Amino acid sequence: DLKLSRGLGDVYKRQILDSVGNTTAATGKGFAIASAALTSLALFAAYVTFTGIEGINIFKAPVLAMLFIGGMVPVVFSALAMNAVGKAAMEMVYEVRRQFKEIPGIMKGKAKPEYDKCVDISTKASLKEMMLPGILAIGTPVVITLIPILVGIENQEVAEMLGGYMAGVTVSGVLWAIFQNNAGGAWDNAKKSFEAGVEINGEMTYKGSEAHKASVT
């Protein structure tokens, strides 16, 4: 970031390049969502072919329950992932504050920060905090398959239940991805609009205002 690195020249003129990068990233996310949706459909078709089921009857209570569970998994996964990001970020904030207190020359450019500790925190925290979302994504279909088999439900019904789960995950996951992509882009653009200056109720609002703080948080 030019502001953090104190780059030469007018920083705000170079924000045009940042806008281009954001546009490219948004376009790339759209392609990623589309490819993930097609991959999910292909896996679902392969699953139906492999199991030999002719259809999924959602009038059956277990299948309908798995459909709802599948719809909830992407939402819960996203919540856990965002919570993990927040926890990792706070650990980084505590480390940066510690370095500011213990190494006074950092702010004046006379002392070198301990970059390795920040990198170590980001790596360890990201791996540790993402364990639960990963277990949720991998373990849920395994549990859905094993428990009915242990109870004594026929394999064909178990296959339909897992198919209902996969259908719920696919539909909910694609819609949730589109929603988050658009919401994230809107929030980012709102923040940048305030940095450039936005007229609200006849008054110009800039960076540092309450409206800008609200858009950031």
Task: Write out the residue ranges for each language-model feature.
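Extended, low-charge hydrophobic alpha-helical regions
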Residues: 10, 32, 36-59, 63-217
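Single conserved hydrophobic/aromatic residue that forms the stacking wall/gate
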Residues: 1-8, 12
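Interfacial and helix-entry/exit segments of alpha-helical transmembrane bundles
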Residues: 13-29
